[in-house]
Amino acid sequence: MKKGLIMANHRIDRVGMEIKREVNEILRLRVNDPRVQDVTITDVQMLGDLSMAKVFYTIHSTLASDNQKAQIGLEKATGTIKRELGKNLTMYKIPDLQFVKDESIEYGNKIDEMLRNLDKKD
């Protein structure tokens, strides 16, 4: 039983990594929307039944308006992305995609800045 669970989790991780790679490629080559030009997919988390993928992204801008535009652009491009995934992946059903801004990079940068400021005070 335990081995089957490990194998299932490994497959979920593999599918997530493949979707991450493919979505990055699709955004770069197939989606012509300027709102998603600077978007990079950082992680994909799959539901256990592979019916949904939570796609985490970052954008190379700190402006709130750019972040909002990127989210809207990704939501508009979801149909194109799913269609391209269907062509490139050998899956029975392509999962639904939910795009979520990855806050971890900004959080890490904020911590780095705080640490640098501490060093300057000493």
UniProtKB/Swiss-Prot annotation:
GO molecular function: ribosomal small subunit binding
Subcellular location: Cytoplasm
A single cellular component GO annotation: cytosol
InterPro entries linked: KH_dom-like_a/b, RbfA, RbfA_dom_sf, Ribosome-bd_factorA_CS
Family indicated by similarity: Belongs to the RbfA family.
Quaternary structure and interacting proteins, as annotated: Monomer. Binds 30S ribosomal subunits, but not 50S ribosomal subunits or 70S ribosomes.
Name of protein: Ribosome-binding factor A
Recorded name of the encoding gene: rbfA
